[in-house]
């Protein structure tokens, strides 16, 4: 009733006050803070001013070492450090190895499945929900609208039978045959399961699936098999070195026993990622560096090296994608300062797994946001709506935190439900009077379908401009005693992922899928010739 009271009154209020030409300005406890996340991120990007910095590195024995000092904020400081190490020998000061284990990724709940499908296949949250719902209705996977990544203990005796029924995965299931399946607390924990457990296969043989359904089923199947495999064992090597007083470092990672990673070894795409925000490009580079295998170094060895001082530029935050937005909604407590409210949001964030896809789709339908490749871009309508909302609480995740806390207090009989409703009515009344006191004639811009089409056409020219800008502002290297190799400028073919999953216009049977350089039809094996190259 709380969502209805707030949404019904606030939507009518803002529509009548600031809408135009039958435009509906919908307001909601989850919808509006979600839009605010996108708008605020976009404003951060628009106002971002890149700043130069310099990184000192050197190549010793075909291995790139980076100065441990990090970034130099002035070129003079970097050149001074460069001059210190020029023509001086590089010495290895320490070599350390540390073995570690990497546990299999957790089973899927709905949000993590939507995140993975968006990251890997560019499927929207709504599209993934529809696909997994289809698999569930065909009894191939379990109930999908779940918010847990655990199984209850009573599922354990059924797991061997489920694995046996999974056709097409025999090469991965065979090593588990005849053995007692491990029962890990990372997988089986009844205390963390409410009405439904994590999404897993049912053991019913999967046949006659579309390509998109097969992709989703394959993610679930491999994840289920992987949890019964041993940990991946690896060794991390860290090598420290110095030239004069300047210290350098490089790290490498060697897989000793792949364990569960065997399940993903033949896939061209990357193995599952941890549940964390999308890393920046520099973090991506660091991750790739750490995963490389290093040559053998010995403490005390020394020799010539090739130093490089590289100019780089700070980069703006990344636009939200559906994957990162879903994670932000799930972990919305991090946007709240009040510790009590943050704790209330910790368990569920804003929205429920089953409703988040619908919330995002509503933002699209209202023309508050649009897609640009994978990125979510706020339209003029979305930006102006957030700017015009008077009550900051309506735009904040704190509102959900306040409600969650009060609902828990009601559950523990510390607070009366009637008081909650009365307070909510009072809050809505204050919101109404606050807006009515605005004597301006402001109106929120209407973003039409034609506006979205123009934006789509405009961005097709963007890759060329971006490439030119990138070439003009690319990192420059200042080297002495050695010339740096120029890096060729590259650009990816641009793509419009919004057509993925739509019905093929040629055969009418398949759906549009995304390849490396073009879109095609999932029915291509049966002769459909539909193909559209990326622009």
Locate predicted features.
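Short amphipathic alpha-helical face segments that pack within enzyme cores
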Residues: 33-34, 112, 130, 219, ...
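C-terminal accessory/connector segments of nucleic-acid motor ATPases
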Residues: 48-65, 91-131, 321, 341
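Phosphate-backbone binding and catalysis cores of DNA-processing enzymes
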Residues: 1-99, 193-249, 254, 258
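Conserved short loop/turn motifs at secondary-structure junctions
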Residues: 21-24, 97-106, 115-121, 144-152, ...
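Positively charged, polyanion-binding regions of nucleic-acid-associated proteins
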Residues: 87-103, 306-315
């Amino acid at each position: 009733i709380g969502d209805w009271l707030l949404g019904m009154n606030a939507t009518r209020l803002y529509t009548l006050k600031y809408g135009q030409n039958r435009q509906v300005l919908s307001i909601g406890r989850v919808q509006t803070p979600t839009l605010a996340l996108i708008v605020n991120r976009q404003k951060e990007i628009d106002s971002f001013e890149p700043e130069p910095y310099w990184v000192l590195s050197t190549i010793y024995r075909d291995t790139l070492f980076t100065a441990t000092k990090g970034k130099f904020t002035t070129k003079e400081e970097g050149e001074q450090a460069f001059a210190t190490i020029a023509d001086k020998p590089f010495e290895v000061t320490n070599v350390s190895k540390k073995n570690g284990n990497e546990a299999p990724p957790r089973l899927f709940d709905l949000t993590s499945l939507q995140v993975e499908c968006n990251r890997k296949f560019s499927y929207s949250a709504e599209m993934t929900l529809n696909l997994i719902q289809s698999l569930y209705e065909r009894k191939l996977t379990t109930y999908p609208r779940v918010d847990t990544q655990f199984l209850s203990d009573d599922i354990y005796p059924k797991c061997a039978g489920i694995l046996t029924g999974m056709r097409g995965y025999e090469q991965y299931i065979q090593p588990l045959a005849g053995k007692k399946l491990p029962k890990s607390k990372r997988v089986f924990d009844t205390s963390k399961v409410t009405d439904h457990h994590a999404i897993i296969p049912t053991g019913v043989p999967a046949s006659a699936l579309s390509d998109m359904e097969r992709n989703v089923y394959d993610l679930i199947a491999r994840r289920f098999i992987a949890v019964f495999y041993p940990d991946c064992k690896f060794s991390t090597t860290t090598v420290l070195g110095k030239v004069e007083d300047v210290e350098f470092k490089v790290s490498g990672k060697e897989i000793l026993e792949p364990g569960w990673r065997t399940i993903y070894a033949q896939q061209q795409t990357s193995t599952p990622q941890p549940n964390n925000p999308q890393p920046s490009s520099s973090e991506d580079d660091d991750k790739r560096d750490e995963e490389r295998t290093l040559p053998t170094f010995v403490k005390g060895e020394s020799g010539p090296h090739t130093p490089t001082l590289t100019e780089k530029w700070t980069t703006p935050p990344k636009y939200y994608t559906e994957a990162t937005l879903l994670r932000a909604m799930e972990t919305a407590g991090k946007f709240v300062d009040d510790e009590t409210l943050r704790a209330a949001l910790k368990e569920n964030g804003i929205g429920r797994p089953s409703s988040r896809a619908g919330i995002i789709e509503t933002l699209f339908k209202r023309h508050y946001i649009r897609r640009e490749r994978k990125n979510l871009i706020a339209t003029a309508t979305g930006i102006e709506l957030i700017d015009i909302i008077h009550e900051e609480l309506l735009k904040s995740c704190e509102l959900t935190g306040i409600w969650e806390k009060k609902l828990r207090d009601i559950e523990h009989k510390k607070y009366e439900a009637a008081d909650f409703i009365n307070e909510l009515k009072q809050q809505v009344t204050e919101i109404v009077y606050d807006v009515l006191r605005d004597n301006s004639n402001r109106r929120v811009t209407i973003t039409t379908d034609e506006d979205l089409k123009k934006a789509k056409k405009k961005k097709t020219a963007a890759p060329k401009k971006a490439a030119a800008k990138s070439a003009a502002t690319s990192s420059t290297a200042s080297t002495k005693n050695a010339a740096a190799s120029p890096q060729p400028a590259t650009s990816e073919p641009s793509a419009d992922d919004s057509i993925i999953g739509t019905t093929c216009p040629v055969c009418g049977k398949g759906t549009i899928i995304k390849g490396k350089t073009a879109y095609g039809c999932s029915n291509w094996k049966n002769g459909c010739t539909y193909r559209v190259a990326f622009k």
